[in-house]
């Protein structure tokens, strides 16, 4: 029985100040399982949609008229010093003011408008999410698929709306955020080789 100053009876759900009758369980697993073949099929169909210029533009991405076909593939780059040329893998390029270099690369590829769209489209979210740390909502821009997350990946990850994914971790959610297929995607040559 309950004595004065003790709250032993308050553990019952039907007593005053008692616990909740059927509260949320910690053990509940919210992740949904998906068959491996279904997951692969979803990824492959989302990958196929990145090729279609119409689907990419209908998703809201802005690409300059100079871009003839999608997806965009970054090969090796050549640096010329003292008349000698050296070829480097694009993923391991020099880190000196690297994010500026990535912006310059994207502008040369005709993706500058889409980066600007993501930067300007950043809005303060409505509702209680702002109190929970999810203050801003940023539109998705370029998806950069690399072999390893170093060099180019580290330089591009801070751009608003740009997502960087290793080829082995590529999934349908990255290629079709919110279930809308046709994301503007840039692959590196080595990432494409790893995907095959």
Language-model features: locations:
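Extended polybasic, low-complexity segments that bind anionic RNA or targeting/receptor surfaces
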Residues: 13-196
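Active-site cofactor/substrate anionic-group-binding motifs, chiefly glycine-
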Residues: 1-9
